[in-house]
Amino acid sequence: GLMDVLKGAAKNLFASALDKLKCKVTGC
């Protein structure tokens, strides 16, 4: 359903934001 799509998009955004944060902290 639509909620599943939104949840998936939110998860992807969260994951990429987490990756960027990790890069800032650990320098990738």
UniProtKB/Swiss-Prot annotation:
Tissue: Expressed by the skin glands.
UniProt cross-references to InterPro entries, sorted A to Z: Antimicrobial_frog_2
Cystine pairs: C23-C28
Major localisation: secreted
Compartment(s) of residence: Secreted
One GO cellular component, as annotated: extracellular region
Pfam families hit by this protein: Antimicrobial_2
BP terms from Gene Ontology: defense response to bacterium
Keywords recorded for this protein, A-Z: Amphibian defense peptide, Antibiotic, Antimicrobial, Disulfide bond, Secreted
Superkingdom, taxonomy of origin: Eukaryota
Parts forming coiled coils: none
Record's function text: Has antibacterial activity.
Family: Belongs to the frog skin active peptide (FSAP) family. Ranatuerin subfamily.
Protein name per UniProt: Ranatuerin-2LT
Organism: Rana latastei (Italian agile frog)
Lineage: Eukaryota, Metazoa, Chordata, Craniata, Vertebrata
